[in-house]
Structures are given as C-alpha cells and as structure tokens.
C-alpha cells in the first residue's frame, strides 16, 4: 500500500511538472503578442508601395485624380511642343507681313493695318499678335532688305481750303481720308548705295513711274510747295509734247488723281479760282528725302533760277511737320 501510494504521488508530481512545462507564463504570452504585432507591422510596411493595398482606405475619385495628374515629363514635353508650334506660327506671320510689305511697295500701294490683318493673317489668328508681329517684321526688313516701315499721317489741308469749301462735307481730299494713318517702306541704306546702279532694279515701268512722280513733286516744290491744276497741267503738256498719256498710261488728270489716291499728292478745291490746288503729299515727303529732292532739281532744272535755299527751307518745313506727326 505504501508503495502504491508513493507511486501515485510520484505520478501526480509528474503530471504537475508536465503541466508546468507546457502552460506558458504571463510574460511569455505578452512577448508572443508583441512579436506578432511587430511581424504584421513589417508586412504592412513592405506592402505600402503597392497602390492596391490602400484600396479600402482610398476612394475611387482620389485614385482617378491621381491618375489624371499625368507624368511630369510628359506634361513638360507637351508644353515644349506647344511653345515650338506657337513659335513656328509666329514666324510664318512675320514672313507673311514682310512679303506683303514688299509687294505693296512694288505696286505703289500703301500698307494699312486692315490690309495686313486681311491678307497676311490667316483666318482665326488673334489680332492681339499684330503689334509683336509687326515689330518683328520691321526688324527683319531692316536686317535683310535695308528697308524699314515708316508711319505716314494724312495731311490736314483744311487750313489751306477756302471758307466755302470747308462747309462742304465731300472733298477730293476726303476720298483718301480713310488712309489717315498707314505705312510705307523707306530705305535705310546710305545715299551712295541707293544711287549705286548695281542695286537699282532695272524696270522700265518703275523708272517711268518714278520719273513722272519726281517731276511733278519737283515742279510743285519749286512753286513754293503748291500749284494750281491749270498751271501744273500746262507744264506737263509741254513735257509730253505730242503724247496724249503720261508714263502711267493715263491722261494727265487721271495720272494726278492716281498720285492723290496713293498719298503722294494732296488736292484741295479752291473756290476762288474754281480749280484744284495740288500740294506735296505726306507720302512723298516721307519717301523722298531733302537730299533726294535737291539732287533731282539740280540735275533736271540746271538752267533755272531756282532759289535752292528757299526751296529746301519750305520743303524741310513740310518734312519736319510730317516727321513730327508720324512720331505722334
């Protein structure tokens, strides 16, 4: 009995010892829980680079906004391409204005803002580009062709008109009032280069045109910068002798009317003598320099008793008035 009791006691102690070895202590339980939390935290950190892991916490609109932001490099490339396209379109506009200015000068037409927009700017082009395109075209004309665009302001001849004429709304000068401000090309080359035959275009029509123009301007200049129609017509008829038309292939009256429309002459009705009076126009004063007029008069009126000092003084006054009005 005593042996059995001993054995039973031994078994109880063994089971108790086994139970003590298997059952974890409180400190072990806490350590195991902390280790488990640490493992889960590390797994979350490893998966944080994947956008899909945040699906439950990120709204669908937020993911859409993130996708719409696009690649910064792609946006920069698109921006550069757009700037390059704008630069190309700008240069095309500049070249169009340069071509139009040269063609207008060749055909003796004035250059107006309205015509530039209609003929040099494609449909749909912003009018806000006009000033910058015009300035760049002027710069390229100077660098490549030796010309610059000069503003011309229509002369105000009301001070020279008779009182009865001022009361009439329609005048010959009013027909060109739409050209109260326009541009023409003027050479920036030195005078010796302008006279160089190698740089002068050999054109019979241009030579005849400018010859007739300079003759008319010179005659008006030596007549104290104004002359009546009958006196000017008589002078031109003597030069043309038996010819019925001028070098412009028009009769005298129509030729003078053409020069008025082109801005080289101003024409005012004189009720006192019932005829037109011609003045040197703003365009002629702008394009024909004082030195150019003096050279022409000296060459083609060598035997005349013209007072060149008085002539140049009057013409210089007209030139200065035009220069100041153009600058304004």
Curated annotation (Swiss-Prot):
It is found in: Nucleus. Residues 1-19 have a biased composition (Polar residues). GO terms for molecular function: double-stranded DNA binding. Transmembrane segments: none annotated. The keyword RNA-binding does not apply. The keyword Nucleus applies. Residues 31-54 have a biased composition (Acidic residues). Pfam families: MAGE (PF01454). SMART domains: MAGE. Sumoylated by nse2. GO terms for biological process: DNA repair; double-strand break repair via homologous recombination; meiotic cell cycle. Signal peptide: none annotated. Residues 1-80 are annotated as: Disordered. Its main location: nucleus. Two subcomplexes smc5-smc6-nse2 and nse1-nse3-nse4 exist. These subcomplexes are then brought together via a number of interactions, forming the Smc5-Smc6 complex. Acts in a DNA repair pathway for removal of UV-induced DNA damage that is distinct from classical nucleotide excision repair and in repair of ionizing radiation damage. Functions in homologous recombination repair of DNA double strand breaks and in recovery of stalled replication forks. Plays a critical role in meiosis. This is Non-structural maintenance of chromosome element 3.
């Amino acid at each position: 009995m005593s042996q059995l009791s001993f054995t039973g006691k031994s078994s109880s102690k063994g089971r108790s010892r086994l139970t003590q070895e298997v059952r974890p202590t409180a400190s072990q339980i806490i350590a195991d829980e902390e280790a488990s939390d640490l493992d889960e935290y590390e797994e979350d950190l490893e998966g944080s680079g994947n956008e899909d892991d945040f699906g439950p916490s990120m709204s669908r609109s937020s993911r859409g906004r993130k996708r719409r932001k696009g690649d910064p490099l792609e946006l920069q490339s698109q921006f550069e391409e757009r700037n390059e396209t704008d630069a190309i379109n700008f240069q095309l506009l500049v070249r169009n204005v340069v071509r139009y200015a040269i063609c207008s000068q060749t055909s003796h037409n004035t250059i107006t803002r309205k015509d530039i927009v209609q003929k040099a700017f494609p449909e749909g082009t912003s009018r806000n580009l006009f000033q910058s395109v015009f300035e760049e075209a002027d710069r390229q004309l100077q660098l490549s062709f030796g010309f610059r665009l000069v503003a011309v302001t229509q002369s105000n001849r009301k001070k020279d008109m008779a009182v009865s004429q001022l009361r009439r709304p329609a005048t010959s000068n009013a027909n060109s009032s739409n050209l109260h401000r326009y541009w023409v090309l003027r050479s920036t080359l030195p005078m010796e280069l302008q006279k160089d035959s190698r740089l002068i275009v050999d054109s019979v029509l241009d030579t005849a045109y400018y010859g007739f123009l300079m003759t008319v301007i010179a005659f008006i200049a030596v007549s104290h910068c104004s002359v009546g129609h009958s006196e000017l017509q008589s002078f031109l008829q003597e030069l043309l002798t038996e010819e019925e038309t001028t070098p412009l292939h028009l009769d005298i009256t129509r030729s003078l009317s053409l020069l008025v429309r082109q801005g080289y002459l101003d024409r005012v009705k004189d009720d006192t003598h019932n005829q037109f009076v011609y003045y040197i126009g703003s365009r002629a004063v702008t394009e024909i320099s004082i030195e150019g007029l003096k050279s022409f008069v000296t060459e083609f009126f060598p035997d005349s008793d013209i007072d060149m000092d008085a002539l140049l003084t009057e013409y210089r006054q007209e030139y200065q008035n035009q220069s100041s009005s153009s600058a304004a």
